[in-house]
């Protein structure tokens, strides 16, 4: 297989780009290359910054990083950050600059892109399962899903994502057989296997979200039957309804961003694609990048504890900047004491519990 790849590249170098086997996948015109470069750079940079911010807020808070719910959200943010960086760089290098790497490097890049997006979907599935357990078994939730079990589950998910994604690098390639219409060196049988795996993850997400939304419906019915008297757990039930709406929103965004890409991948298995369809696939692929950009926005807006953590960080940085601006040496000790006292008085936003994603 290595000889096949080397021979094709060597022949391409002799006859020019027209004979390069990778040229069939480099189908963008000049204006389209510019559009892809601009969109990938902006979306990738914004997505990376957002996800880094979410990761920092979770890891810098002792309270958040001990909760399984936020471990799953942190895993999602980490996967989306890696996806933003790896996908944007690899996509622009290939489609805009026509960069051709060695077989091992190319398969490493495409495997890394596949792994990060697969881990992102896997993290969403674990988040959905976490919400289901919270709503289905509220009394025993904390004993059922401990921090240790959450970490073990995340480790298994990441290892499985890496194993599935790096199979082409381990030898499952198409050379010398015909490759996929959309991905160099990737055989159609591997693409079909990956599509089935992703379909399994999506099915799990939809099935779990369905139970979450049904549980929310039951809470609404319970609320309507106890309007005239105070019932313990009422606030929790209202919270669960909002959580269900949040998960429904995440699911809708996930399907909108992923369905076009997955549909074109499945279509490529059944027929030969024209250059127009390949160009459409290239632009639809950036919808996955948009999904990575939207995920932290949804969680930042919905999670009261993350917003409270951001409020603490901003207040702390603001006071640090003010402290650095103090020129009088005799004012330094008093300024430090004042800042410490002010930090101790900072309280979460009044509505932080209303949208808390992990209040189970």
UniProtKB/Swiss-Prot annotation:
SUPFAM superfamilies: Family A G protein-coupled receptor-like
Molecular function GO terms recorded: cannabinoid receptor activity
Disulfide feature: none
Tissue: Preferentially expressed in cells of the immune system with higher expression in B-cells and NK cells (at protein level). Expressed in skin in suprabasal layers and hair follicles (at protein level). Highly expressed in tonsil and to a lower extent in spleen, peripheral blood mononuclear cells, and thymus. PubMed:14657172 could not detect expression in normal brain. Expressed in brain by perivascular microglial cells and dorsal root ganglion sensory neurons (at protein level).
Induction: In macrophages, down-regulated by endocannabinoid anandamide/AEA.
Residues with attached carbohydrate: 11
Post-translational modification: Constitutively phosphorylated on Ser-352; phosphorylation increases cell internalization and desensitizes the receptor.
Segments traversing the membrane: 34-59, 72-92, 105-129, 150-172, 189-214, 247-267, 280-301
Keyword vocabulary terms for this entry: Cell membrane, Cell projection, G-protein coupled receptor, Glycoprotein, Inflammatory response, Membrane, Phosphoprotein, Receptor, Transducer, Transmembrane, Transmembrane helix
Modified residues (Phosphoserine): 335-336, 352
Protein family: Belongs to the G-protein coupled receptor 1 family.
Protein name: Cannabinoid receptor 2
Organism: Homo sapiens
Lineage start: Eukaryota, Metazoa, Chordata, Craniata, Vertebrata
Chain's gene name: CNR2
């Amino acid at each position: 297989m290595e000889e096949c790849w080397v021979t094709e590249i060597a022949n391409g170098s002799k006859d020019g780009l027209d004979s390069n086997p990778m040229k069939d996948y480099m189908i963008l015109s000049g204006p389209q290359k510019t559009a892809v470069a601009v969109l990938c750079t902006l979306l990738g940079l914004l997505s990376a910054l957002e996800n880094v911010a979410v990761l920092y807020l979770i890891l810098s808070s002792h309270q958040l990083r001990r909760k399984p719910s936020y471990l799953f959200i942190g895993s999602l943010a980490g996967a989306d950050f890696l996806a933003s960086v790896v996908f944007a760089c690899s996509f622009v290098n290939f489609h805009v600059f026509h960069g051709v790497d060695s077989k091992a490097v190319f398969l490493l890049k495409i495997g890394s892109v596949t792994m990060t997006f697969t881990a992102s979907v896997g993290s969403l599935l674990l988040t959905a399962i976490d919400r289901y357990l919270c709503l289905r078994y509220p009394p025993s939730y904390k004993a059922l899903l401990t921090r240790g079990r959450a970490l073990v589950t995340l480790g298994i998910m990441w290892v499985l994502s890496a194993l599935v994604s790096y199979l082409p690098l381990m030898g499952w390639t198409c050379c010398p057989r015909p490759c996929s219409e959309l991905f160099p060196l990737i055989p159609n049988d591997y693409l079909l296997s990956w599509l089935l795996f992703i379909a399994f993850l999506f099915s799990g997400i939809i099935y779990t979200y369905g139970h979450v939304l049904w549980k929310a419906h039951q809470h609404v019915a319970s609320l309507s039957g106890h309007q005239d008297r105070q019932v313990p757990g009422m606030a929790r039930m209202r919270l669960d309804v909002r959580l269900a709406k949040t998960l429904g929103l995440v699911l809708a965004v996930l399907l909108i961003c992923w369905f076009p890409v997955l549909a074109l991948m499945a279509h490529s298995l059944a027929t030969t694609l024209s250059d127009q369809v390949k160009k459409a696939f290239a632009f639809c692929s950036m919808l996955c990048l948009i999904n990575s950009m939207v995920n932290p926005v949804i969680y930042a807006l919905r999670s009261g504890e993350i917003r409270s953590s951001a409020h603490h960080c901003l207040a702390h940085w603001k006071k640090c900047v003010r402290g650095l601006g103090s020129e009088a040496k005799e004012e330094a000790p008093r300024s430090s004491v004042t800042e410490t006292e002010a930090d101790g008085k900072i309280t979460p936003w009044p509505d932080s519990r209303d949208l808390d994603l992990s209040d189970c």
